[in-house]
Amino acid sequence: MSFPISRRSFLQTGLVAGVSIKIGFMAPRAAAALVDNGIPPSPGWIDASGHARFRLDAIAKVTGQKTFSRDFRARDIPGWPATQSHAFLIHATRADRRFAGIDLAGLQPDLQPDRLVLAADLARDGVRVPQPDFYGDVFLVPQGETPRLLGQPALLIYKDFARYDAAKRKIRLDDSVVRYGAVTGPKPPPHYGAARYVRVEGPTQDARDEFSALEDAVIFGGFAGDKVVWPAADARAGGMGKGMAMAAVIDEEIASAGDDALMLKRDYFSQSIDASAMEADNGNVWYDPAAQVLHAVLATQSPHEVATNAAALVTQSKFSLKAVDLKAGYTVGYGTKDKVIFPYFCVIAGLYGDGLPVRLANDRFEQFQMGMKRHAFWIKDTLVVDRKTHRFSVMKAELKADGGGRANLSFAVGIVGTTAAQSIYYLPKSDLSIAVLASRAVEAGSTRGFGTLQTMAATEMLVDEAAAALETDAIDLRLANVFRSGMKNTQGAVPAGALRNDEMLRKAKTHPLWAGRETRKANYDATHPGRSYGVGFAQVQKNYGSGAEAAVVTLELDRDGRLTMRHAAHEMGPGVTTSQAVIVARVLGRAPDRMSYGVVEWPEMPLTSTELPFTTSQATEDELQRNPRWTPTFVSPMATSNSAYYFGHATREAALVLLRYGIWPAARALWMRGGGKIAPNMNGPEDLRVAKGKIIAGDLEPLQLSALAAKAHELGAVTGACVHAFNRREWAEAEFDLPGAGRVGLPVDALAVKYGDGAAPALKALMRVGGFHFIERATVRYPPVQRLNAGVTRYAPMATLVELAVNIATGEVELLSHHSLLDCGPQIVPSLVSGQIQGGVAMGIGHALHEFLPLYEDGPGDGTWNWNRYQLPRASDVATWTQTAEVLQPLSDSDTPKGIAEVTMIAVVPAIANAVHHAIGKRFNEFPITPEKIRSALS
């Protein structure tokens, strides 16, 4: 298929056919839709063996055709008015006094806004924040109240760009525009939560733990001011009281540690940063009051959630709504466009646009001012090690995170960071706690790493220091304590799959950078006066998946063998559109000819959901699942490194349904033509293989997919499959009564199929739900709700060796080279894995050495921050041409891919800190490690 060069042509082919989906929990007349983002594949992108030669969208990228949400104007979108209005927000730069209103006297009359929107307007019109416990109680600060955070008191709308641009420039840094009243001190929302994971192992590895989160309880605390109040300890009780009693036992063991134990107590700090996605937050929204339709083009990682929340926002207001038409362009966010409030500001702008499309798009100053940040963490770690065996006996971590002025995912980030604090080690006793505090800072949320970078970096630095105190090799100490397959994590759960941390440690120990580090240091220091050489190592493992992952995929095979795929995933940059197509090719011998991603409309999958997968009780879920059309959640956002394993599972299962119940009957019929006999050892679809784009089995004739498709249609076999999958630390499983096949069990919770053209009328009559036969499940088994207490069960590990030099005079750090080891299971697309390693390591280098944001009044909330002040790593900072990596070979043909988008950036951070210590003998427990800090330490 050709890929036209014109941007306008791309818009027309990729972003036109918007259709509506019904949202179960909304008013009956309201609906939401998303244009399915059709992607014509670049010619020759995949070879006959199913390997991607380059990205599916590669030619679009290099010819300028890859459009982002930010590229759209009203005139680019068929059916929209040609006139484009523009809006911007005026931000409160003080959050310690009352907001007294807006003074636009500094703007001459011709620059006054066509519409000024204040909190009072929203209150009058019933425009309220969806999920106020998550996104905050107000969009705009009410007059007379103190801003909850360094935020937004007003929205200005202009009907032409020139006036908008001139006004924005004139008042950008004008402190007189926002008027303030009495000083009140900060008034942030209540703190977001406190949790504690206590584990004490049982008498043997297989025995029940004396206490763990999985088998007993996660301990939750309240707040008295900024202090956490934990439940009372009660050893005779169950649940949280018993957990607090076990925590007291751990405290006693730490306090009584004798000379035979090494005890280290250290404080660490990890700073707030901006993920600096190249596309800033933006949206373009047209509310058509005559048709009562809200049209939107928005940059988001979670289009399904945005569509449903936007519909809910409007339907509860005075504005009438029949449909939401959400068009999704490509975007990139590193987590910062997942569950963020900005799309709803865009919706508000559209509602007050007087029937014209309104574009609200942050420039880089504004993105720093209100874009999602990585959480600052304060960490107090305690580690007790047996001096004789070098085994860890106890670890205690007391963590505090600043979530800023909106709750967002802060508590979830804190919990995930807490459960990750064990890094790659087995801990017999552990007490890991987190307090997530609210403040007036810019909100923090789902930024790459999700709290684990902060906590695992601290652990890896602590372990290196312990090795030095014990006078042992740092990798040997890690090997003595490595978390192995079958062991329990700090939540009491046994991870799924084989853990290969020990294998990676052994590889790292024999790598020339590590094995020869002392000789290399002596030689380098002798030949480079004024510079000091160091090598550092760290290894981490990052969970992937949220604990409630869901995906939906449809595959259809036409009579000529052409495949069409509709997918809930959408492209965020890492290459999900390419990888999901390759998964199909690996199963069916051919990649889809036509693909639509970011699809929200699923008429063939008529499921309902309460969308409370983390909080529904077991009793309630047991009752809900009696409805064969219920699921805990319909689709996940693109986050938590979930595409390769979780979305890929749904893709693979849809392809396997086609293979087993469409391709196999067709292949068997073709191989038995003319009275011939199928090979006696060919028992079923499990014998089918893909080779050079054809379906083969044993020594039978290879078959083209086109021939198989024609026969499948003739037979009336399955030629289309839509599956919905749900995972709560394990896959939901269901049984379906599939015509012609009997009762079949699948690792999915919903199934719909389409039958071929030759199907009997009775079968065709069943295809009445979006053209498919939705087969209500006969039985279902959802993983128990208690599985959520496992915290995580799937890990992807990565290790990084760093070689650097410190300039003794200036304190500057130069990375000379780095080498990484990664276990990602089978690589779906190796070049995409390489890109994740390179990009992740570069981002980690920025966190370790360069990037920093103050939290409060002198931070990004004041509107003066841009890349002129915020230092990102450049190519010269990341050892571009001397970096190497090794990806472990998969354990078997059936090994599953792992999500790696986050783990790739973490290990390099503590590895740099450990290398700096090796270079100059000084330890740095706060990031970033700047030249100023190094000079101070050396002075």
Positions of PLM-derived features:
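FAD-binding core of FAD-dependent oxidoreductases
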Residues: A182, P186, D325-Y344, E366-M370, ...
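Helix-loop-helix junctions that connect adjacent transmembrane helices in secondary transporters/permeases
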Residues: P203-T315, V482-D560, Q786, T800, ...
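Flexible, low-hydrophobicity surface segments
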Residues: F25-A217
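N-terminal export signals
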Residues: S2-F3, S9-A30
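C-terminal catalytic domains of large/alpha subunits in multi-subunit enzymes
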Residues: A120, Q316-A323, L351-V358, V413-R448, ...
